[in-house]
């Protein structure tokens, strides 16, 4: 998606939900109609989902998950956190109803409680009570960096969050 003026931005170069969270529709045999699921997933999950819908086995090198358990209404969360990045300019993690966005070149931290603020308009990062949440999300973000092979150094920029 495009920002089209949201947050004062015009393009796609951001990690706000209006730009990175796009609608996905699944249709086919065995797929219930009229269902809406809000669980965050990765675009790469589509391959595993398509393979399952086609009755084919997922190759071992495919790291992502089929969305069919979600589609069938099973109570699963394929990921405990969703990782995002844009070049070396931004990183994000969405977890437990929060989103942490980092701009390492300017050492900026943004925190949103998505359950209360789905439009990401009320930055909570400056509130003292948010620091434990920021640290928890930052720790998970660092683990996701390792898992994905992301070598951007966030530890030196955000040493106070360690």
Whereabouts are the PLM-identified features?
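Histidine-centered active-site microenvironments of extracellular/periplasmic hydrolases
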Residues: 1-32, 42, 91
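C-terminal cap/loop subdomain of S1 sulfatases and analogous C-terminal strand-loop tails that border
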Residues: 1-6, 44-47, 52-114, 119, ...
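Active-site rim elements
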Residues: 11, 30-40, 53-58, 121-130
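Generic secondary-structure boundary signal with a strong preference for alpha-helix termini
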Residues: 11-13, 23, 108-109, 129, ...
